[in-house]
Structure formats: C-alpha cells, structure tokens
From Swiss-Prot:
Residues 339-359, 571-581 have a biased composition (Basic and acidic residues). It catalyses: S-ubiquitinyl-[E2 ubiquitin-conjugating enzyme]-L-cysteine + [acceptor protein]-L-lysine = [E2 ubiquitin-conjugating enzyme]-L-cysteine + N(6)-ubiquitinyl-[acceptor protein]-L-lysine. Keywords: Chromosome, Coiled coil, Metal-binding, Phosphoprotein, Transferase, Ubl conjugation, Ubl conjugation pathway, Zinc, Zinc-finger. Auto-ubiquitinated. SMART domains: RING. Its main location: nucleus. It holds the Pfam family zf-C3HC4_2. It is found in: Chromosome. E3 ubiquitin ligase essential for DNA replication origin activation during S phase. Acts as a replication origin selector which selects the origins to be fired and catalyzes the multi-mono-ubiquitination of a subset of chromatin-bound ORC3 and ORC5 during S-phase. PANTHER family: ORC UBIQUITIN LIGASE 1, RING FINGER PROTEIN 219. The modification Phosphoserine is found at residues 210, 522, 549, 557, 564, 566, 715, 717. It comes from the Eukaryota. This is ORC ubiquitin ligase 1.
Length: 722
C-alpha cells in the first residue's frame, strides 16, 4: 500500500521537462529508471543509440520505454470532454483506495499498541503497590460474588480474611523495617560525614606533624647552635692567645728587671772597687798583679761553667775568636814601648768573658810562651752578650754541612740590624764527629788567620795623636791604610792590605748572601723546628746560667741591654768595659801627648762598628756628639771602617774626683739620631754594648715581639701547643 502511494506520488511529481530537448514534455515516455523524455525525442535518440541518455540503461525491444497514461499529448484535444472526465475520475478512485487501505492498517497498529500499553501499566502497578493489586483482585472477586451472591462460601471468606490479616501484619512489619532502615541510613550518613571530617582533620594533622618538617627545624636550630659554639670557641682562642702573649711579656719584663737588678748590684760592687784602683796611680802596677791573676782565674771559672752549656763547635769557635785577638795584640805590642811606661798595666776586671788578649799580654810580659794559652781554648767562653729575653738563641741560623767553609755564611754571621739582638752562627757543621775532629785544627788555623786580618785594623787606629780628632778612619784600599799607618807611625802596610782584601771579600760575600736568601718549603719547616728547639735550649741555658754563674750572666745581660734605665747605671756599666779595652789596647799605640789631652777639654767618643758599602750612603752624615757639657760635635768620614767608642777620661784619668764627676754629672756616650737610625749589617761582636738606653730598650722590646711572632708563625710545635 505504501509502495503504491510512493509510486502515485512519484507519478504526480514527474518532471515536466525533457532531458533531450530541455522543453516541456510532450507525450511523456519513462525509462526503467523513471527518466522522462518526449516520445519524439527518444525515438530520434534510439535511432543512433540504444541507451538512455540520462542513465545509460540499455533500451531494447524487450525493455522498451513506457508511455505515461494521462499525460498531456497531442491527441488530447481529440478526446471528448466526457472521456477526459472519466479518466480523471478513475485516477482519483485509485488514489482513494490506496489511501483507505493504508489508513486501515494504521488503525490496527494503534489498537495493538494501546493494548500492550495497558498491560505494561498493570504490571507496573502490581510491582509498585501490592495492596492495590490485592484490592483490585478483591474487587474483581466481589463483582462475581455480587453477580453471583448465591455462590459465596463462608469458609472462603474466613480464609481470605486470614490471608488479609497475615498480609497486613507482613506489611506492617515491612513498613517498620523500612522506617528503621531509613533512620539507620540517616545515622550512617551523619556518621559518614563526621568520619570524613575526622579523616580530613587527621590528614591535616599528619601533614603538620611530618618528621621532615620538624627535622628541618631541628637541623636549622642545631646549625645555629654549632655556629654559636664555633664563634665562642674562636673568641676564647683569641683571648687565650692574647693572655699567653701578655704572660710572656710579663715574664720577659720580670726577667729584664731581675737582670737589671743583678747588673746594678754588680755595677755598684765594681764601682766601689774602681775608685780604689784609680787612686793607686801608675806606680802601683806591680802591686796589682796578684788581684789581676785572681780576677782572671775567677773569670775563667765562670766562663767555663757557662760555656759547658753550649755546643762544642760553638765553644771552640768562640775560643778561636779569642785567640785571634791574642795574635792581633801580639802583633802590635812591639811597636808601642812608650805605652808601657806611660800607662799602667790593666787592673780593672772586665764585664764579659773576653780575657784572652789580657792573659796573653800578661804572659808575654812575664816571659810566658804563647803556647801556654792553648788549654784555654776549651775552657774559655767568648764574651758574646746574652739576650735580655729567654729567646737569645732563637736568632741562630741553621747552616748546612757543605756551607761550613763558605765565607758567605761567616760574613752573614756578623750581620745585625740596628734594633735587633746579636746573632750567633755555628760555622762548623761536620757530617760526623770524626770529620769534625779531623778538620778542627785546619779550621782553627783558617779562622785565626781570617779573624786576625779582620780585627787587626781595629787595633791600629784606636787612638790618634792629633788634637782635633780622636778617631781614625780606615779606607778599604791599601793607600789610605798606608796613610793611617804613617799617621800612627808604626803600622805595617802589609796589615792594612790584608784588612782591605779581607773586608772586600766579606762584603762581596754579604752581597751574594743577600741574593741567595730564597728558601724552599722544606728548609723553612726545618728552620721553624730549629728555632723551636733553640728557644727551649736557650731557656734551659738561661736557667742553668742563672743558677751556676750569676755574676757572669749578670754582666752579659747588662752588656746586651746596654745602659740601664738610669743614665748613671749606664755609665758605670760601660766604664769598666772601656777600662778593660783601653788597658788591652793602650800598649799597642803610641802615648797620647799632653797637647792631645788638653786641646779642647772635650771627651769625644767614637763607635766601634763595621760598615758595608750599602751603609756608607746611610752614614754620610753620621756624627758623634761629645759630652753634654761640651756642646760640640765631630763629623766622621763616610768611609770609616773601624771606629772605637771609648772615653779618654776612662782610660787616662786616675783621680777619684774625675771618676765621681763622670759618675754623677756627665753622660759619656751619646749617639746622634743618624747613629740611631743607622742599620749596619756588619758589627763587631762587642759593639752592641755601647748602644744608648732608649735604643736598647726599644730594640729589645721589638726584637722580643718579632721573635715571638716568628716563632708562633713558623714553629709547628708552637702552634700545636697553643
């Protein structure tokens, strides 16, 4: 039915144009695919082709094109009006039938669907409300009963009542259970919400109480505490270092005061003996022989006691330096017989242990041989002044065994900064004790020759007979040395040539030493350990010297410190030493004339030191002032090699009044500012004994601090102890 409706609808909606002529269709013809053509057009097309022009479907006599009934054609006007009316009527009837059949089919389908819908609704009701179902069933039962009241049975009614009662009970129970379940469900929902909130709270609390979070806080707190403890430890270490330094300074001051007190006591005792010795005059030279021998023996015992604490190479070398002065004194003695008549023999005891030249002179006077002085080499202690601090040996240099014959090391041993203490250099370091014993005689002879050449010139120019100047200037060349020999009168030219050549060699060695001062790290560590051991050894030696030979130790400490805090103590300290040196050297010089003594009435002291070429430029304006009441000064030449600082009043005056005047009124030794600022790299071993008080104290304090700082920085054992 629907198929026919579609066909009818298609027929009513056929196109009205031809596919071939594209005009209004006349006598329409349809192919199998319902393509409309004009009958005339398709006939012409089929003459040449056997396919549909639109879809290429073959058009054969078995499958021809079909004509449409009721289509407009040329023959229509030929039909009558009644015929056309009947044709239209037949077409409408056909269409009406088709539509009616289709309407009937649709109505049947609607009825079937309604019945199915009712059945489904009834099923839903029975499922959702069983009571209504029961009531519905009862109503259905009542209707038949009502219809058939005669057929109702009382037994069935009772049975149905029982069923109804049981059903009601079940319903009530189920209803109560449903209510309880609803309440339980509400409670569970509330509990679930509370548990969810508790769970969230616990999660947040766990996050807040995580060990990592508190661990970070704990680590930060511990780190801050550790840093605080480290800062406190560093502060305490610094405070401990400062306290150690302060304690060391106090100990050094205490030792300094002890030495100064001992020196004052010794100087007072010496000054009490000095006026009595001066009052005897030159005629008492024969009577002073036994006291001199006694003082010499006492000094020898003190020197041997203090020398036992030093190393054997240093003691033998220092004794050799004493023997050098013996030879230099013996060389100049025959040239000055007038000194023996004019000046008495030496009568004053000396402050240091340098008694070898005096003993040599006495032995030569009494007919002794120089060979008798040989045993003194092992017992004598060379009079090098000890430091005022326990670190006097900390300035020693550590020399390698192969450098023991190098003159550079020997020249460097005499170098000394102006405000530093003296330095000792142990020149002899042998690989074995046998080698030291084998080479000892050779080294002694070589050292005697060198030192005699170096120090002989100091004896030659000690005093000058000229009234205008009391100091002599020695040049480095041989010509000026000869001029000095002519002015003095009895100095051989060979001695000055030797001194000039020796000094030039020593100065060149000093320059090479300054260029080779670089050290490796291993040598620096060895030097640090050596300085540490030397400081310990020096403290032991100072204790032993104080216990065994207090007199000698006091003299040596006074000699290093120079003048004490009072100027009178300084003059008394320097006076006997000048008397000793004068008594030792006055026999080797011509006698001073009376004109030389009375020329200006001024005492013009000079210093005894050794100058390097670098220091000649610094000492061009070097001047030595006279005593405080003279007011005049004397300028020394820049090429001065040896200048000896002694007072003529100390050597020539024998009256007690002059000694008292020197004791209380005059300052015999004053050095200008140029002398104080001058730093001579080479000095004589006894030149530091005549340094002024202020310079000595400043030098001792600065040297103490420098030695302590160097030991604290360089010594590993010192660092570990601190």
């Amino acid at each position: 039915m629907a198929q026919t409706v579609q066909n009818v609808t298609l027929s009513l909606t056929l196109p009205i144009t031809c596919h071939i002529c594209l005009g209004k269709v006349r006598q329409p013809v349809v192919c199998t695919n319902n393509h409309v053509f004009c009958s005339i057009c398709i006939d012409l097309w089929l003459k040449n082709n056997s396919q549909c022009p639109a879809c290429r479907v073959p058009i054969t006599p078995e499958n021809p094109c079909k004509e449409i009934i009721g289509g407009t054609s040329e023959s229509e006007p030929m039909l009558s009006h009644t015929v056309r009316k009947h044709l239209r009527k037949t077409r409408l009837e056909l269409l009406h039938r088709e539509y009616e059949d289709e309407i009937d089919c649709l109505q049947k389908e609607v009825e079937e669907l309604k019945s199915k819908n009712l059945s489904l609704e009834s099923q839903i009701k029975t499922i959702l409300d069983p009571l209504a179902l029961m009531q519905g069933s009862q109503n259905e039962d009542k209707h038949p009963l009502a219809d058939n009241p005669s057929k109702m049975d009382p037994d069935s009614v009772v049975e149905w009542k029982k069923k109804l009662r049981t059903a009601n009970e079940i319903y009530e129970k189920v209803k109560d259970d449903v209510d309880k379940l609803k309440e339980a469900n509400k409670k569970l929902k509330l509990e679930n919400g509370g548990l969810l909130r508790e769970n969230l709270r616990l999660k947040a609390e766990v996050d807040n109480r995580s060990p990592q979070k508190f661990g970070r806080f704990t680590v930060a707190a511990l780190q801050s505490k550790v840093e605080q403890y480290e800062r406190e430890t560093n502060r305490l270490k610094k405070a401990l270092e400062r306290s150690d330094k302060y304690i060391e300074e106090l100990e050094s001051q205490v030792a300094h005061l002890k030495h100064s007190e001992e020196a004052k006591e010794d100087v007072d005792a010496l000054c009490q003996r000095a006026p009595s010795a001066d009052s005897k005059g030159p005629n008492g030279s024969d009577e002073l022989g036994p006291p001199k021998n006694q003082s010499d023996s006492a000094r020898k015992q003190a020197g041997s006691a203090s020398a036992s604490h030093l190393a054997s190479p240093s003691s033998s070398r220092l004794a050799d330096s004493g023997s050098v002065r013996q030879e230099s004194t013996s060389r100049t003695e025959p040239n000055c017989p007038q000194n023996k008549d004019r000046y008495p023999k030496p009568t004053e005891p000396r402050l240091g242990a340098r008694e070898t030249p005096m003993d040599t002179y006495l032995e030569r006077e009494w007919g002794s041989k120089p060979s008798d002085c040989a045993p003194y080499k092992e017992d004598e202690l060379y009079g090098i002044p000890a430091s005022c601090t326990p670190l006097s040996l900390s300035c020693l240099q550590l020399n390698t065994p192969e450098n023991r014959e190098n003159p550079v090391i020997k020249a460097g041993s005499s170098k000394k900064h102006a405000n530093h203490l003296r330095k000792l250099v142990f020149d002899d370091f042998c690989d074995s004790p046998n080698a030291c014993n084998n080479n000892s005689s050779e080294d002694d002879r070589r050292e005697n020759e060198k030192k005699s050449d170096c120090f002989a010139s100091s004896k030659t120019g000690f005093w000058d007979c000229c009234s205008t100047s009391y100091a002599q200037s020695l040049e480095f060349d041989g010509s000026e040395g000869n001029a000095i020999a002519n002015s003095v009168g009895e100095i051989p030219s060979k001695l000055s040539e030797k001194s000039g050549s020796c000094l030039s060699k020593r100065l060149s060695c000093i320059r090479s030493l300054e260029m080779n001062r670089t050290r490796t790290s291993s040598e620096a560590s060895m030097d640090a350990a050596y300085l540490d051991k030397i400081s310990e050894l020096d403290s032991m030696m100072s204790e032993s010297d104080n216990s065994k030979s207090p007199c000698n130790n006091g003299f040596k400490s006074v000699e290093v410190e120079g003048p004490s805090k009072s100027p009178q103590g300084r003059e008394f300290l320097e006076e006997p030493d000048k008397l000793q040196e004068g008594s030792k050297l006055n026999l080797s010089k011509p006698a001073l004339t009376a004109d030389g003594l009375e020329s200006g009435g001024e005492w013009k002291p000079s210093s005894f030191f050794l100058l390097s070429p670098a220091d000649h430029e610094m000492s061009e304006d070097f001047s030595l002032h006279s005593t405080s009441h003279s007011g005049t000064s004397e300028v020394k030449p820049p090429n001065c090699l040896f200048q000896t600082e002694f007072s003529q009043g100390a050597l020539l005056s024998s009256s007690q009044g002059l000694f008292e005047d020197q004791r209380f009124g005059s300052s015999l030794f004053k050095i200008s500012s140029e002398m104080q600022s001058l730093h001579s790299p080479l000095q004589s071993p006894w030149s530091a004994a005549f340094v002024p008080e202020k310079r000595s104290k400043n030098g001792n304090q600065s040297t103490k601090r420098k030695i302590q700082s160097s030991l604290a920085n360089a010594s590993p054992s010192k660092a570990t102890k601190s």
